[in-house]
Structure formats: C-alpha cells, structure tokens
Design a protein with these regions (language model features):
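Glycoside hydrolase catalytic-domain context in secreted enzymes
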Residues: 4-756, 761-779
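Short beta-strand elements
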Residues: 779-792
C-alpha cells in the first residue's frame, strides 16, 4: 500500500490523489480513498472524541474540561496517532477568546478559529489528508455561541403548527454552524412527547406522530439545504433518538422501554421515518433499551428496521458513551472489544466514545482481528462516513488545496451566528398559547399600570432552558451544574424588558411583598415556570409550579386585581392556583426574543394562535394521557400511554381528561368552520383532499390552526378515538371567510394488523372512516363537523 505524501502546495498537480480531485464523483473519490486506508485508519474514522481531549490538562494529560484551545501535542495524539475521524463539542465545551482582543470568548469567530486550528492540523498531518467532521448539539439554533439568537425549544415550535417556522429554524441554525465549520448537527429530536416526567420533553415537537413528522421533516430540509458552493448539503441533520427513546417505563432518561412491536410500528416509528424520508444524512441511536435489549446493540432495530424496512443509507452514530455502556452499564458483554462488536454488528457506524481514543482504537482492532467484526462491515461503515464528509464539502475546503488558507472565514462567522433574530421572534409569537382568558381580560391596555413579578420575569436562564450557551443553560447562581460563563448572557428580551419596552407604566416587583405593596397596579403579570435543565437532570416524577410560585399567585389573587400568569416551561406543569388565574399564557422556553413576543400578545399587537402540541394534565401527579390512546396501560405505575376504554370499570382516573387537551389554544377572536367536504372514497395507497370554510366571526384579525382528525368506528384492532391525519394554519381577517383545502395521505390511517404478536409495518385497512373537525374547547373529542368516507 503506497504511503501518500501529497501536500497542499501540489494540489493542482496531475499526480494528486483521486479522492482529492473535485472533478471526480463522490463514489469514485470514496472508493479511491478507502482503497488506500489501513485498518487503524478505518477504525479511527468510526470514533468521535470530545474537543476537550485535544486540550492539555494539569499534569500534561490530554482531556481538559476547562475552556482552553487545543494544543499540538494533544492533537498529535488524538488526531494523528489514534487517527480519530470526528470531534464533538459537548454541552460545556465552548472555546475561549481566540482573537487576542480581550473578549470573553465563545463567539462565532472563536468557534471558527477553533475549527480552523483543529481541521488544518488534521489535514496537514494525517497520512491521507482526511478532514475531521465536527458534531454539535444545536437543537433550537446554534445554542453555544452566547451572542446567537435562539429559537423556541422544539415543544414551543410544535405549538406553532407551522412547518415554515421549523424549516426556517433549521436554515438559520445551518447558516450559523456552517459558517464556523461545525457541519454535523445533532437535531432534530423525533421522539414523541408522551410522558411529562421525562427531562427531554421540551426537545420534542409533539405527542402526535403526524405533527412531529411534519415539523421534523421541515427542520431536516432547513438544516440540509442551506447550500453553499458545489455541495448539496448545508449541514448534516441527525434524526434522533432511534427509536422510542422517550418511552421509558418510569419517565427517566436513558432507561428501559416496554414497547409492543405493533405500537412501535404504528405510533413510534412514523416521526423518525419522516425525517429520514426528508433526506436526513444521519441517525442517532436511542440510549435506552427496548424490551430488555439495548438499542445500541439491537440488530432488529438498526439493521432489520432502519436499513431493511426504512431503507436508510446514511451514517448511524451512537449517543454519548453508549457503546462502552454495553459493558459498563448494561453488562451484556465483558469488555470494550465485545461492546464495540455488538454495536457495530447491530448497525452502529460511529461511536460517540468521547473520552478514550486509545481504548477505542485498541479494542476495535481486537474485535476485527479476532473475527468478531468483519473487514467488510468496517468498510461499509467507513464508506458511509467518508461519503458524508465528501457530501459536506470537507475535502474541498480552501485549506485542503492551500495550507496557508483557513478552512472557514472566521471573520464572517459572527455575522452568520448572530443572524436570525427576527425569525426567532416570529416563531416565539406564533408559539404562545393562550390557555385561559376569563372575561377577556386580555389584551391589556397599552398604558395600563402593570406590575411584573415572578422568578422567571427577568431570567434568560429560565426563559431559554437547557442547551442554551451550555448544556444546563445560561449561567444562574441558583443552579448547581454545568452552566455557561456568567459573563455570557445572550442578548434578547426577557418578559420584564419586553413589557417595559411596550409599556412605560410597567414596574417590576422583585418579590411577593413588593408586588402586594404596589397599590397602583391595575393588573399583575406573573412569570413562573421551571428552571433550566437538560437530559436526566430534568426528570421529575410530578412536574409542577414550585410551592413558592403557587403561593405568590394565590396571594396576588386575593387582591381582586387581574392576575395574568405567564408560564415559561419545557412541558406542561401542575398549575395549582394558576389554573384559576384570570389569564394563563404558555410561552414554553420561548427563545431569546420571548419577552418581546409575550408583550406583543399581552398588549394585543399579536393575536395568539399557538395550540398545544401536548396534553396538559389536570395536576402534577398525572402524566396527562395521550390524545390518541387506545387502552388501559399495561405498565403499572404508568397511566401514560393509553386512555381507559369507556365502560370497562376502572373508573375515571385513567380516562383522557386533561386540564387542556392536545390541540387546544384560545385567540382574541373566534372562528367558525362550515361546509366540510370529503371525498366519499379513497384508495388505501392514495390521498384525499378535505375542504371546509373558516370564518373569522370576531373583530380581530387572527390565525386559525385546524387539526384534522379521523375516527374508525369499526375495525379488527382497537384504534384511537381520533387520530390526527393533517392540519393547517389559515390567516383570516375579521369578518371574512376562506375556503381551505387540506390534503392527507391514507397512510396516516395505517395500523399494524394481526393478532397480539403482530409486528409488521402499518397497513391501511379497508372500510368506513369518519373525518372530524373538533370544537376548540377543553372537552376532549368534542366534534364540530364530520363526514364519512370509505377506504378501498
């Protein structure tokens, strides 16, 4: 095997390697490079290490968790000797100031400079000049650089029911990350929000497969079509966490799920499928286990279903430390070599090993040399990884052809990273969900004497949640773990500053005593909710407003003045006395611009249009149930998956009877639906167009979100009372009407047919169905209009 000695100065020479010739096809370039690679070089491509392994810790070891730049010795060790092919920026891995201008670091320019340092070293010093691929969690915008505008967390984006907003959010994220070189984005989360206790609920779009599918697919397209130059990809999107990650039996992160295969096929898989069908280049694996088999070691999940049934062709990556966890946590193998063999043979192409490049290299080579992993399987995985790198243009960066040039233009990175503020504001405005508005207390008069109070009134930390500047969020002294630099507070508007900008009469009361002492108050705006958290640190057996927040609301209610509660949270929470407040707004963790958006709604500049993408339980002790549940839960302490069937004698406690149902949200106007028209017949592999009229019967222009549901009166298997099959957003001026057309595929009616052991893909059963539009009330399944149709 030749030892290639090409250098950047020789880029135009005829003898340059075929894989560096941009005139060749990607397939030809991959073939040429793969043929030249040694086995250690190949297994190195299958490993992803934390960026901090490239920095020097005390005592000369590589692996500092501080905020230092990579150094030559550690880059040599990890990138050249261990031949690591991918680098991860973990939740706390923000770069220091790299400009020499005395800044506080963690800007777009700093991220680009860090990338240039690492990438140039890898390209110039590796035998075959193979660039590294850089991965980062960017779940609601480029969440690391402190100056970047952030979008609402995904559950808030779900409340917009706006695929355009999801696409724009992806495109703005891609613009920012691509400008800094970090072109592998670990988003979107396509898990379903079916258990409020789970600490990652806010990272999901919705509890419903159709809504999550539509938004996730749009987000993938936004991420991957920010085109630049000759390459088709903006950045690589990652559908995660395949599959069923959110379904743990106890609401804890990275835990066991018990999933009937029919439920997996008909309910859990569709949202992942939508992201894959939208073109997602990569898939990340569920960290938990399903039916006692770790997903990372499941050939059935990662090969039979993902590759065979779904036809996925891209890269499969494990989540953080999940391959070694097969040995250390799941105990299904005695050593790391065995863990690697199980994961790779199941279908994992790259391991997010993060800490131990040498351990990966040694154990992976042992697995191949012992025959536990075949050379063909290694080549298959590396071929996928190299294809991704070529598609992203990593082999055609300026620094590949001329070592004196940077890989990305760091001087342009800040502009790209800080763009998107107007788009984030629009998404926040669309997300806000009005849950209660007694006696039309809202909107408030623009000059009203508003008193703003509550622990989340002036907290960018609580407003943004996790994955914002740092893993556990923006710095706040009340938190204990893993937050950003206290100097790095993102620019934007809190609820307080947003209200004060809109109303010069507004005053801030820091605590209950000062709020009660504000005798001139005409209304109280109380901003409450959750503190920032991420992953398992957010798991909560009974999510609810804390006692001090509930006490504040109750004390203000005694004054007799209007109390408007603004909830800033990543999931529905038990409201306590807030449930009887004069008005309740759910603002989610609503972006850096959420304060302005809240003020726009409070004072009537914006008519709220958001609708719940997730059911809101009656109290914190209940998980809430799912809108499309079908049967009592078989899981003991989990009334989370299913509704109680009528008349089965188990009492009302397990019925779908939330405080606010899926799809609910009020407006400052009223809408009427009429003239519903549905095709009388539909092919099982076809689609149909639903038509109806929307009339704005109020005095304010507004946007109506209309979910379209289907009921199957009789069938061979138990089906939900209603299934969401489509939805639309329609803007209608006061007093006007619009005819609306909504198209849906018959495949949305699919179910896994057969007996208890059924496990195949969903099929559409012939028979009679009823299409339904619901009333916008707190009563579940209250039908407004309906029409029958037949599938044949």
């Amino acid at each position: 095997m030749p030892s290639t000695a090409w250098s950047g100065a020789e880029a135009s020479a005829p003898e340059q390697p075929a894989w560096l010739d941009s005139g060749n096809s990607v397939g030809k370039r991959v073939d040429a490079l793969l043929q030249e690679m040694t086995l250690p070089e190949k297994v190195g491509q299958m490993d992803q290490q934390l960026v901090t392994t490239l920095t020097d810790a005390d005592g000369g070891r590589c692996g500092d968790f501080g905020f230092n730049m990579p150094n030559t010795e550690c880059m040599q060790k990890i990138l050249i000797e261990q031949q690591t092919g991918s680098i991860l920026a973990g939740g706390t891995n923000n770069p220091p100031d790299t400009t020499g201008k005395g800044g506080i670091g963690n800007t777009g320019e700093d991220w680009a400079n860090e990338y240039n340092t690492i990438q140039s070293f890898a390209i110039q010093n590796s035998r075959l000049h193979i660039p590294v691929i850089f991965g980062v969690d960017a779940v609601h915008g480029f969440g690391h650089p402190w100056q970047a505008p952030l979008f609402p967390q995904s559950i808030g984006m779900g409340a917009t029911w706006d695929t355009g907003a999801a696409l724009t959010g992806g495109a703005m994220t891609a613009k920012a990350t691509k400008a800094t070189g970090w072109t592998w984005v670990f988003a979107p989360v396509q898990d379903l929000a079916r258990d409020n206790r789970w600490g990652r609920t806010y990272e999901t779009w919705a509890e419903q497969p159709v809504l999550a599918s539509a938004l996730g697919a749009a987000n993938v397209k936004g991420l991957q079509t920010a085109r630049g130059g000759q390459h088709s990809l903006g950045v690589a999107a990652t559908v995660k966490h395949f599959a069923g990650y959110s379904q743990s039996i106890n609401g804890h992160d990275r835990n066991e799920a018990l999933l009937p295969l029919s439920y997996l096929q008909s309910t859990i898989l569709p949202s992942y499928i939508a992201g894959i069908d939208a073109g997602a280049e990569t898939v990340m694996v569920n960290s938990g286990s399903i039916n006692s088999v770790p997903a990372t070691a499941s050939h059935y999940l990662l090969t039979d279903i993902l590759r065979g049934q779904l036809g996925f062709k891209g890269v499969v990556i494990s989540d953080y430390q999940d391959v070694p966890a097969l040995q250390t946590a799941y105990h299904i193998t005695p050593d790391l070599s065995g863990a690697i063999a199980k994961a790779v043979n199941a279908g994992v192409d790259m391991s997010m090993q993060v800490f131990d490049a040498a351990g990966w290299q040694t154990a992976a080579l042992q697995a191949v040399q012992s025959g536990a992993i075949s050379q063909d399987r290694i080549d298959e995985a590396v071929r996928r990884i190299l294809t991704l790198k070529f598609n992203l243009g990593l082999f055609d960066q300026p620094c590949m052809k001329d070592y004196s040039k940077p890989c990305v233009d760091a001087s342009a990175a800040n502009d790209a990273v800080t763009s998107g503020r107007a788009e984030a504001l629009k998404a926040a405005q669309e997300s806000i969900t009005l849950l209660r508005n007694q006696n039309n207390v809202l909107p408030l008069a623009a000059d009203s004497n508003v008193v703003v109070t509550g622990p989340s009134a002036d907290s960018m930390t609580n407003q943004l949640g996790g994955w914002s500047v740092s893993w556990q969020g923006v710095f706040d002294s009340g938190h204990v773990c893993c937050m950003g630099d206290p100097k790095q507070i993102p620019p934007g508007s809190t609820v307080l500053t947003g209200i004060q900008a809109a109303n010069s009469n507004a005053v801030y009361a820091r605590d209950q005593a000062s709020a009660l002492a504000a005798s001139s108050a005409s209304a109280y705006v109380v901003a409450v909710g959750e503190k920032a958290y991420a992953e398992g640190l957010g798991d909560n057996p009974a999510p609810a407003l804390p006692p001090d927040q509930q006490a504040l609301i109750a004390a203000l209610q005694v004054t007799g003045k209007p109390v408007i509660v603004v909830v800033l949270a990543g999931r529905p929470v038990g409201l306590g006395p807030a449930a009887t407040a004069d008005a309740v707004l759910m603002a989610y963790q609503g972006s850096t611009e959420a304060g302005e958006a809240v003020a726009d709604v409070l004072f009537g500049k914006v008519n709220p249009s958001g609708k719940l993408p997730i059911s809101w339980p009656t109290d914190a002790a209940k998980v809430g149930g799912d809108f499309d549940g079908t049967a009592p839960s078989p899981l003991g302490d989990q009334p989370k998956f299913f509704d109680q069937l009528t008349g089965t004698g188990s009492g009302p406690g397990h019925a779908y009877n939330p405080l606010y149902p899926f799809g609910f949200g009020l407006s400052y106007t009223t809408f009427q639906h009429s003239e519903l028209k549905v095709p009388s017949r539909m092919s099982a592999n076809g689609s149909g167009t639903v038509r109806f009229k929307v009339t704005n019967t109020g005095t304010v222009d507004g946007t109506d979100i209309v979910p379209v549901y289907v009921n199957r009166p009789i069938g061979d298997t138990v089906t939900p009372t209603q299934r969401l099959v489509a939805f639309t957003r329609v803007a209608v001026k006061a007093g006007e009407s619009k005819m609306v057309s909504v198209r849906f595929k018959a495949s949305a009616l699919g179910e896994t047919a057969g007996d208890i052991d059924a496990s195949g893909p969903p099929t559409v059963q012939p028979g009679d169905y009823v299409l339904q539009l619901n009333k916008n009330t707190t009563t579940p399944y209250e039908v407004d209009l309906s029409a029958k149709f037949t599938v044949n």
